[in-house]
Amino acid sequence: MLFKNILFASSGTAGSDNAAKLAFGLAEKQQAELTLYHCCGVPSRGFTTNVTDTRSGSLEQPDEAYQEMVREELNTAYAYQIEACTRPFRMELSVGMPSTEILRYARQIKPDLIAASDPNAARMRSIVGNTVRAVAKKAPCPVLIVNRPCTTCWHLFSNIVFCTDFSEAANHAFRFALNTARQLNAKLYITHAVDITSIQGMTMDQSEIERHTEQMREKIDKLYLSKLDGFANAEVIVREGIPYVEILKVARENEADLIVMAHHSSDLSDDDADIGSTVEQVVLRSACPVASVTRPEAR
């Protein structure tokens, strides 16, 4: 099985509905263990024991009655997914800073995948909120960011778009994309978009464009095609333009149901690099889930 242990990081709001559907669906298809994890309250400042509810913003006393109320509300919110899923699942609650608590629990149970979404997607210019951003940066496994309904994911993923800028971080993402495509018998599109914004002021004629494109294809052949190890269902696509625009075009043209990207594009250490702007723009506009991969041990 590709995923044996899935952690669904729920905000407890409607913003997590799409991630919930995918997490429960993947757990059912993969016969995986599933944990629904919700950080229900952020401790208030001062000497009070009250917490600020992460859904309503109200002050609450984090006693047994409050936690039982939260459990009932989560069971109601995800009643359809819970009823449809034949796999047992755990529901875990915590109090603290959401990103810190999610990462702490992830280190404890060692999931293969974290599914999450940004509850403020509809009103935030930046789709990747502080919690998702922090989790994606430090997570010990791939983080699947789901902000729109995935209509093709119920049968798992059949068309996977892997995007590379040839950084070390992209190598980690490639291993995850290849492993996923191999185990699910999916088509893998290895994609690179030449950033035209980095060559402004330069005029390239058609022969130069073709030569540059061929160089990128040769680089893909050396770095990635040579490591397919018998996997034959792969296609190389090289485009020129604004990277996130071209990535979304490739995904749309090939009916992708998963995009795999490195969490960051530069060769910074995993702990120093913030989520890349291209990833953020893809997440904002993608019609399918986006897997952010940070670390080499990602499966």
List PLM regions with ranges:
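Gly/Ser-rich helix-loop-strand patches that form or flank binding pockets
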Residues: 2, 25, 29, 99-153, ...
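Hydrophobic alpha-helical membrane-association signature
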Residues: 19, 173, 216-220, 278
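Small/aliphatic-rich secondary-structure junction motif
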Residues: 1-57, 158-206, 229, 233, ...
